[in-house]
Design a protein with these regions (language model features):
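Conserved glycine-rich Rossmann-like NAD(P)H-binding loop of the short-chain dehydrogenase/reductase
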Residues: 4-13
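SDR active-site strand-loop-helix element
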Residues: 9, 49-53, 91-97, 146-151
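Short loop/helix-cap segments at secondary-structure boundaries that form the rim of catalytic
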Residues: 15-22
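Cofactor-binding loops of NAD(P)H-dependent oxidoreductases
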Residues: 26-30, 189
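NAD(P)H-binding glycine-rich loop region in Rossmannoid oxidoreductase-like domains
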Residues: 30-71
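Conserved active-site region of classical short-chain dehydrogenase/reductase
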Residues: 34, 73-81, 206-209, 213
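Catalytic helix-loop patch of NAD(P)-dependent Rossmann-fold dehydrogenases
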Residues: 63-78, 85, 90, 99-145, ...
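Alpha-helical substrate-binding/gating segment
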Residues: 151-154, 172-193, 200-224
Length: 224
């Protein structure tokens, strides 16, 4: 697609109906299966990684920071070391707007906005961003990090959609409540907004996919 041949690696393929739709899909559970990447990289002549794997619940990261540092940081370190070993020099990393914390202006304007994460989840993303800079300087691994806000939406053709267990995302929960005629609870009434409720920025998953393709092209052209 778009000149690229994607190969999917997931730790639990059998419970992921979305992944099962594709042909080149492999089940790998880090760290014990990381050696399996050797054959995949060589078989497909892979020269770039797109890493979207992470634990993402802010609340859980506060309750269980060890779980988040182990999965989001240590596992990423192992992946970078494997890239170094296999001479894979390009990676796109899914970071998060959580690295910003609470900006003094109340709005994140650009990449010069201060980075002050206020929870372990945000800290793990910022740590990996710093790791990527170090691996670029020392080993020539080039990277682009996207600081996503709230990813949402589904494939316009209806082939893939949101898939969380348990579901915690607001849009699918609202849709579910509407279809099942259930009440929907919206929490928070003391934010500095016109009605006191939280305002969030959303980015559609197809826009994310398009951005990742453009990022791959930039890496291929050695622009980043």
């Amino acid at each position: 697609r778009n000149g690229y041949t994607p190969v999917i690696v997931d730790r639990n393929i059998k419970d992921n109906p979305i992944a099962q739709q594709f042909n080149d899909v492999y089940e790998i559970n880090l760290p014990k299966d990381i050696h399996l990447l050797d054959d995949i990289v060589k078989r497909y002549n892979i020269d770039s990684f797109i890493c979207t794997a992470a634990y993402t619940s802010v609340g859980e990261s506060v309750r269980e920071p060890n779980k988040y540092y182990q999965n989001n940081v240590v596992m990423m370190l192992q992946l970078l070391n494997k890239m170094k070993e296999l001479n894979v020099k390009k990676i796109i990393f899914s970071s998060s707007a959580a690295v910003y914390g609470i900006p003094e202006t109340g709005i994140c304007y650009d990449d010069q906005t201060g980075l002050e994460p206020i929870n372990p989840y945000g800290q793990t993303k910022l740590i990996v961003e710093k790791m990527l800079k170090d691996y670029n300087r020392a080993y020539g691994i080039n990277s682009i990090s996207f600081r996503y806000f709230n990813a949402a939406g589904a494939d316009p053709e209806g082939e893939i959609g949101e898939l969380h267990d348990p579901e915690t995302h607001i849009i699918p929960l609202i849709i579910k409540a509407g279809f099942q005629a259930q009440d929907f609870s919206l929490f928070g009434n003391d934010y500095d907004t016109p009605d006191g409720t939280c305002i969030r920025d959303y980015v559609h998953v197809t826009d994310i996919a398009d951005a990742q393709i453009q990022a791959l092209k930039l890496l291929d052209e050695n622009i980043c």
